[in-house]
Amino acid sequence: MMKFLTRMLSAFAVLFFAISTAQADDEVRIVIDEGVDGARPIAVVPFKTNGSVPADIAEIVTADLRNSGKFNPIPVSQMPQQPASASEVTPDAWAALGVDAIVVGQVTATGNGYNIAYQLVDTVGASGGAGAVLAQNSVTVGAKWIRYGAHTVSDEVFEKLTAIKGAFRTRIAYVVQKNGGSKPYEIRVADYDGFNQFIVNRSSQPIMSPAWSPDGKRLAYVSFENRKSQLVVQDLGSGARKVVASFQGHNGAPAFSPDGSRLAFASNKEGQLNIYVMGANGGQPTQLTSGSGNNTEPSWSPDGSSILFTSDRGGSPQVYRMSSSGGAASPVGGRGSAQISSDGKTLVMINGNNNVVKQDVTSGASEVLSTSFLGESPSLSPNGIMIIYSSTQGLGKVLQLVSADGRFKARLPGTDGQVKFPAWSPYLDKN
């Protein structure tokens, strides 16, 4: 595990910090709008520290578990004790509060970083005797990776208790339109919770619709540099940018195929706005849609066999589904911006009231997850547990986070401009 984590941190350093781009001054941070009272109670006890630590590990893990909507961490003030290891836990004291699992741990300063050790403890004996250790691990990270270390704990605890892979070591890309300046448009990347934000590219002209490659190493986006819409693919490690589509008219809404070899996009290069597919590095595109109406916002199925897209061919915008090689399309519902979960079971999209909804692929049953004003661009976490989207608040755009079960809702407001077009990264830890 330690060798693996060291390799991953080295890869992250190359991928995200060797871009030679500016660190953003103002980060988006989660502001809770609605809690998770109906979720499973859990306790994350403050970690015992040895020396000064640049971040509160327990606080980060608590926030991660809460943000998933699956857990309702109890506040420190309600904890009957604050053990640092499993041997110090009094199971009955926690079971009396309805808490069947707790996280305890220690953080120790080392010569070149911090060692984070945790134990997940069963307080009711569901997996054996009360007080049994369900999971434990320790990781050593440098100071700037302290939050990554905490998210590692969150991922492991989450997966142990839910059998779903955690996605707290992922990132989000988004566009910020700043208030003034010669280059007010920026693409930024941050941890999923808004921390460790940095600028990928800035421009005097609009930037739109960032999309991640499946390996997390590239972003495709729309740039209006040179006074025309172009599709750009940028390597996040080197910062190298390549214009892959600059056809006459509009070129927009890029989406990488699941294997990363192709890009689907929308273009009106032949007059009508249609869906096209081409190689991820550019090349001659293949037109997939035709007929009346405008077609845009392509999104691939997890296996790459089909594409969801938005079309007004029926008179008003609606989501359709077709083969990734083109052909007949069937209506799905909603109004647009559809994305399918990685297991292929759930669709997330915008409905006619501009709310974020999820829809069961098999039954067609749907549920409204957000009622915020003018919801746009929903993007699923790679495990399908959380959704980030943009909405209008006052005169500007902010990012919103909602758990896929609708229990937890929060905002990630920007402090230096409008924030829009969020895109959740794939898994970046590769475990």
Swiss-Prot record:
InterPro entries: 6-blade_b-propeller_TolB-like, PD40, Tol-Pal_TolB, TolB_N
Keywords per UniProt: Cell cycle, Cell division, Periplasm, Signal
Signal peptide: 1-24
Domain of life: Bacteria
Main location: periplasm
Renumbered residue ranges of the record's region Disordered: 318-340
GO biological process terms held by the UniProt record: cell division; protein import
Cellular compartments annotated: Periplasm
Role, per record: Part of the Tol-Pal system, which plays a role in outer membrane invagination during cell division and is important for maintaining outer membrane integrity.
UniProt-recorded name of the protein: Tol-Pal system protein TolB
Designated gene of the protein: tolB
